[in-house]
Amino acid sequence: MGVHVSEDEIEKAVKMSRLDKLISRLEKGLKTNVMERGVSLSGGEKQRLALARGFLAAKDSQFLLLDEPTSSVDIENEAEIYRNIFENFKDKVVISAVHGLHLLKEFDYIYLFKNSRIVAEGTFNDLLSDENFRVLWKNYSRENKK
């Protein structure tokens, strides 16, 4: 990656991206080859590996820009990854595009887009006062009940 990182930083990024359990099951751990002819990873595992690399690359940056970084990750891991992001990047600006509305409560400020235009903005509570967002939230909540 061209970025010098310590073993501790790698371990932290692995935990933040929720790859630690997978890596602990691999015979060679972090030394496992995941290139062609290496270990086969699922889409979510590949995405979490990319996130871990991104966390390491962003360690000295003031901004963390994410574009649906967890779109292939299950909802429980996704929520934990975002908790880890907000906990470990407290002093950074985190900008993230998400489609999972359940994550919105975690953000300080939200821009809601429709057809490439901002149709609402504010905190989660601000958005709940917007009729369009309220309908969207209600439908999303109903569809995603466990």
Predicted segments with their positions:
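C-terminal portion of ABC ATPase nucleotide-binding domains
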Residues: 25, 83, 100, 105-146
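Conserved H-loop
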Residues: 91-99
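Conserved D-loop-proximal element of ABC-family nucleotide-binding domains
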Residues: 43, 74-79, 121
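Helical segment within the ABC ATPase nucleotide-binding domain
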Residues: 78-90, 102
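Catalytic "switch" loops of ABC-type ATPases
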Residues: 2, 99-100
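ABC-fold ATPase nucleotide-binding domain signature/coupling loops
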Residues: 20-49, 53-55, 61-62, 66-69, ...
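ABC ATPase nucleotide-binding domain helical subdomain, centered on the C-loop/LSGGQ "ABC signature"
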Residues: 1-36, 83, 91
